[in-house]
Each structure stands twice: as structure tokens, then as C-alpha cells.
């Protein structure tokens, strides 16, 4: 299992939002490049970067992403506002390892087919965000009448990874829902990256035991609830 620290970008700063709400931040740091470097210095082997401005349609942070890639020697995955092939290709050309797509793919499945032809499925992460058992899109504002497993099955042979977010606990530091993750792992062969509500080393142990591919950790690292080095030790042992 790999641990993937999250660096969320807004207005060229590193932020942490509560429940994805742009007006509710519980953290703002001025130098995202330094934040990324610190995670890598502590042993992170992969980074998860979300461009919130691109996601909200209020600009983008591509220059910051470019600088992070230049300064760290680990691969990064990037999500947020990837609504056409040009943006995806531009990110890959900047040195991004994987692009994360969600809403666009779920509303227009052909987008994944086209993206697959352009960059290959190993570079594609499908974001499946779940609230009260159903998939949500458009920044968690709209519900789709499908369960996570139904959406995953639809794209199973077209994407390399699934990023599964449990919106019910995201950014609230509430712990994880093991049952929902267990079901996904049992029903699909795609590597699953889990995000949402991870607060303790116990959560990480539980996810490791389930056999998940990776976990994204945000709030808990920034608030000092999880020590990255200790988390990485659990994963390696």
C-alpha cells in the first residue's frame, strides 16, 4: 500500500477545505512547493495534487504544479477541472504521472475512451465520490442514480485506478467506513486509492489489511493527527 499526501491548491496557496466548500478553509499555507518537499523529505513516494481553482472554474494553478514537479523527485497525480483532452495532455506534458477525472467522465463516458487513446489507461484515475451510498458529481452537489460499484464496473477496463472518496466523512476527520471499501475491493480488480476521513494510524492499519492500493491523507497530516513517518512505517512493515 502507498500513502499519498494531499496538496490542495487555491490562489497559489496550499489549503484544506471543509467538505469541499471554497468558503470554509481550516488551513492555508503560502508555499505549496515547500509543503510538497516536506512530505517527500519525510518519505512520501507519491503526491496527490488537486487544483481547486480549476475545479471551481476560477482559474488554475498550473505554474505551481509545474514548480512542485520540478522540485520533488516523486511522481504526482493531479485532479481538478480536467474537462477536456487538451488540459489532460498539457498536464501529462508538464510531467504529471496520472490525471484524475470525475464529473466529466461520469456524464460523458466517451471522454474516457478518447482520453484512453491519447494517454493510455495507466495514466487515468477515475474519481468516484460517494455520499449516502450514491455517486455524487459537480463538487459533490449533484447525485447520480448509481452506486459506486455500478460506476466502477462501467469503466473497469478503461482506467488504471479508482480514487474513491467517502464524502460523508471527507475533511471532517471522522474515521473510515470499512464496509464500503471492503465491498469495492471484493468486486473489482482495479487498484483503489481511498480518500476521506482518515484520522489515525489505526485507520491506516485497517486499510492496509483490506488490501487497498493506496490512501490519500490530507487534514490529518496538516493537523498533526498522523505522523507521516509513522504511517509509512506501518505500510512498510
Swiss-Prot record:
Organism encoding this protein: Methanocaldococcus jannaschii (strain ATCC 43067 / DSM 2661 / JAL-1 / JCM 10045 / NBRC 100440)
Gene Ontology MF term list: 1-(5-phosphoribosyl)-5-[(5-phosphoribosylamino)methylideneamino]imidazole-4-carboxamide isomerase activity
HAMAP family to which the protein is assigned, alphabetical: HisA
Active site residues per record: 8, 129
Upper lineage: Archaea, Methanobacteriati, Methanobacteriota, Methanomada group, Methanococci
Keywords from the UniProt entry: Amino-acid biosynthesis, Cytoplasm, Histidine biosynthesis, Isomerase
Name assigned to this protein: 1-(5-phosphoribosyl)-5-[(5-phosphoribosylamino)methylideneamino] imidazole-4-carboxamide isomerase
Enzyme class: isomerase
Alphabetical GO biological process terms: L-histidine biosynthetic process
Pfam families, sorted: His_biosynth (PF00977)
GO cellular component terms, A-Z: cytoplasm
